[in-house]
Amino acid sequence: MRADTRDFRALFLGDAPLLDTRAPVEFAKGAFPGAVNLPLMSDAERHKVGLCYKQQGQDAAIALGHRLVSGAVKAERVAAWAAFAQAHPEGYLYCFRGGLRSQISQAWLREEAGIAYPRVIGGYKAMRGFLLETIEQAIAECGFVVLGGMTGTGKTDVLRQLDHGLDLEAHAHHRGSSFGKHATGQPAQIDFDNRLAIDILKKRAAGCRQFVVEDESQAIGSCSLPFGLYQGMQRYPVVWLEDTQPARVQRILRDYVIDLCGEFTALHGEQDGFGLYAARLRQSLDNIARRLGGERHRRLAALMDEALARQAGDGSVDAHRAWIEPLLTEYYDPMYAYQRQAKAARIVFTGDHQEVLDYLRGPGRALP
């Protein structure tokens, strides 16, 4: 039998299959990428055992757990674990702290199914602690460069072409602006942290000593950046990306109209999907109504409605340029110009896509 492990680094670098025996409610609050939740106890069973533990102590709680998970219920859960173990012989199982739940699951697998399957010592809590420490170590030990630029310049496009780029928006599943929501929801905060940490771990293992991050607010939608990283981003050197106005409009059209519509229609079908997409686009504009001002919001909303009507009629998206262009020039550009001025002393390079890529791939990688 493979030994139980506490080598968290190897687990995450190797994308080891992980069998999570915590209750569904625990799993929903945060998990590791690719982990499969096959719980020892349901949420209701866990709640009953927890009450028993508080009122009568550990022995009584363990006895109740064995009564609740017995017979056909036990056989069904062991069968699910056995199927996972057979499909993923290189995997591991764990519970919250690496204690009784994973030990019981491990013992039942061995006794009932004849499968010796290793567990993670310390469980979810220890693995989560390791990942948070991974982020903190990177902030303390690595160099960071912030990639800035006006809305629509393609900062994310550049970032994804860099081996040492950390795509915070991808981990948050959000494009980082008032229009940044996707058709599907964002991960839990814990999931965001875990994804970012594993990305950092793998890139450092591949030899990265410096990272490039996109200029972001402290929150990307509902996901907050690690506090130490956000603090650092207020002092790290900045590389400023520039592009032409037509190219920026085209990129916004691609991301927030063409791609977003495609996401909704793929999930919900042409008719329902288009309706949900149109509602999302209108809501995104409404979210900044107060900052736009009443008259400007009404003007842009009317242009958006006209563009949506034309898109619904013949599939054309060109009319969306009529609201995208003034949204950039009248709202986003003045805001970003102010931010650029505030960062002026930290800007170490300015250029177009290829120039910025060449600079960030160079031996100095923007370190002052």
Swiss-Prot record:
Residue pairs linked by disulfide bridges in the UniProt entry: none
Domain (Rhodanese): residue spans on this chain: 12-136
Keywords on record: Selenium, Transferase
A GO molecular function held by the record: tRNA 2-selenouridine synthase activity
tRNA processing as UniProt keyword: no
Reactions the enzyme catalyzes: 5-methylaminomethyl-2-thiouridine(34) in tRNA + selenophosphate + (2E)-geranyl diphosphate + H2O + H(+) = 5-methylaminomethyl-2-selenouridine(34) in tRNA + (2E)-thiogeraniol + phosphate + diphosphate; 5-methylaminomethyl-2-thiouridine(34) in tRNA + (2E)-geranyl diphosphate = 5-methylaminomethyl-S-(2E)-geranyl-thiouridine(34) in tRNA + diphosphate; 5-methylaminomethyl-S-(2E)-geranyl-thiouridine(34) in tRNA + selenophosphate + H(+) = 5-methylaminomethyl-2-(Se-phospho)selenouridine(34) in tRNA + (2E)-thiogeraniol; 5-methylaminomethyl-2-(Se-phospho)selenouridine(34) in tRNA + H2O = 5-methylaminomethyl-2-selenouridine(34) in tRNA + phosphate
A Gene Ontology biological process term: tRNA wobble uridine modification
Catalytic machinery residues: 95
PROSITE patterns found in the cross-reference section: RHODANESE_3
Enzyme class label: transferase
Enzyme Commission identifier(s): 2.9.1.3
CDD domains, sorted: RHOD_YbbB
Role description: Involved in the post-transcriptional modification of the uridine at the wobble position (U34) of tRNA(Lys), tRNA(Glu) and tRNA(Gln). Catalyzes the conversion of 2-thiouridine (S2U-RNA) to 2-selenouridine (Se2U-RNA). Acts in a two-step process involving geranylation of 2-thiouridine (S2U) to S-geranyl-2-thiouridine (geS2U) and subsequent selenation of the latter derivative to 2-selenouridine (Se2U) in the tRNA chain.
Family to which this protein belongs: Belongs to the SelU family.
Entry-linked NCBIfam families: PRK11784.1-2, PRK11784.1-3, tRNA_sel_U_synt
Subunit relationships: Monomer.
Record-given protein name: tRNA 2-selenouridine synthase
Organism whose genome encodes this protein: Bordetella bronchiseptica (strain ATCC BAA-588 / NCTC 13252 / RB50) (Alcaligenes bronchisepticus)
